[in-house]
């Protein structure tokens, strides 16, 4: 199993759709990948929460992953979101993603069925045994209604050497702290919340899987790049400059605000698939104003 570099800013890619939402806009996806790499991100994560994975068909998911891999051309690693409420489906999706060229997979904790900690452990170990590739765990209890504990994560890591990282979107810096204490030398910890990236890196996380970097890859990756280079003051300044936008991209369900921002920049349609709906006018105006303030600050510096 090859090593997977996991530090810096990884973009949780949106999936561009045609204006009617009926098909994936692959031209816009190609352009998005190119913009991310030009902006200095460390890697790409298609078909996660931000990629609207629940409303993609299996064929679309595989096609999106393959297209991202092709567009990246080996310049950055591609880690595909393959998690599901079903262990069997997670294994099947992970194998398909690897066959499409992904360097690793990210598996969200099973949602809806509300498994116990033992269930989360057995699910993850079953996937790890069946998928001999780097695996990133994804804990986002606000969406899955199950919270992978630090103790369970430690038990998983003891039994599954190919579990190499965790995207922690618990919103709990104390959880990050406990993960670092237990597993800091064994497991790479990545923030799953742009607004907490700097705090989590101060505790020992190595980067972020970011939503905001879809819109501003250069500015978002500057936070992690500066921190990892030892420039705490520069990282803090870059982080604080983005804080307003981080918040605005979640005032409505993700990824509708991010797609609204990208549409305003002319990069894709704002279309999302039901049951999501496009961001409202008030949100679009707030995002536009925040972007203008960021641009003015950049020009003044």
Curated annotation (Swiss-Prot):
It is an enzyme of class 4 (lyase). The keyword Amino-acid biosynthesis applies. Disulfide bonds: none annotated. The active site is at 138 (proton donor/acceptor), 167 (schiff-base intermediate with substrate). One of its GO terms (biological process) is lysine biosynthetic process via diaminopimelate. Catalyzes the condensation of (S)-aspartate-beta-semialdehyde [(S)-ASA] and pyruvate to 4-hydroxy-tetrahydrodipicolinate (HTPA). This is 4-hydroxy-tetrahydrodipicolinate synthase. The lineage of its organism: Bacteria, Pseudomonadati, Myxococcota, Polyangia, Polyangiales.
């Amino acid at each position: 199993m090859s090593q997977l570099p996991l530090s810096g800013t990884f973009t949780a890619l949106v999936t561009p759709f045609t204006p009617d939402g009926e098909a994936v806009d692959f031209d816009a996806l190609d352009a998005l990948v190119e913009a991310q790499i030009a902006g200095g991100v460390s890697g790409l994560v298609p078909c996660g929460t931000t990629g609207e994975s629940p409303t993609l068909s299996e064929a679309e998911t595989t096609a999106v992953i393959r297209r991202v891999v092709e567009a990246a051309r080996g310049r950055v690693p591609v880690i595909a979101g393959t998690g599901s409420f079903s262990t069997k489906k997670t294994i099947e999706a992970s194998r398909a993603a690897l066959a499409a060229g992904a360097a690793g997979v990210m598996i969200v904790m099973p949602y809806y069925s509300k498994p116990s900690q033992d269930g989360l452990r057995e699910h993850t170990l079953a996937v790890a045994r069946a998928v001999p590739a780097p695996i990133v765990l994804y804990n986002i209890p606000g969406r899955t209604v199950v919270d992978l504990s630090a103790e369970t994560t430690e038990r998983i890591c003891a039994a599954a050497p190919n579990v190499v990282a965790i995207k922690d979107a618990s919103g709990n810096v104390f959880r990050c702290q406990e993960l670092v204490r237990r597993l800091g030398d064994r497991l790479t910890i990545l923030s799953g919340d742009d607004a907490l990236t700097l705090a989590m890196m101060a505790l020992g996380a190595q980067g972020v899987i970011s939503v905001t970097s879809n819109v501003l890859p250069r500015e978002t990756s500057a936070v992690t790049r500066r921190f990892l280079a030892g420039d705490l003051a520069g990282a803090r300044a870059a982080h604080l400059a983005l804080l307003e936008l981080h918040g605005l991209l979640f005032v409505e369900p993700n990824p509708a605000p991010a797609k609204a921002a990208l549409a305003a920049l002319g990069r894709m349609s704002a279309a999302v698939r039901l049951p999501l709906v496009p961001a409202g006018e008030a949100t679009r105006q707030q995002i536009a104003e925040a972007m203008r303030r960021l641009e003015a600050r950049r020009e003044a510096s």
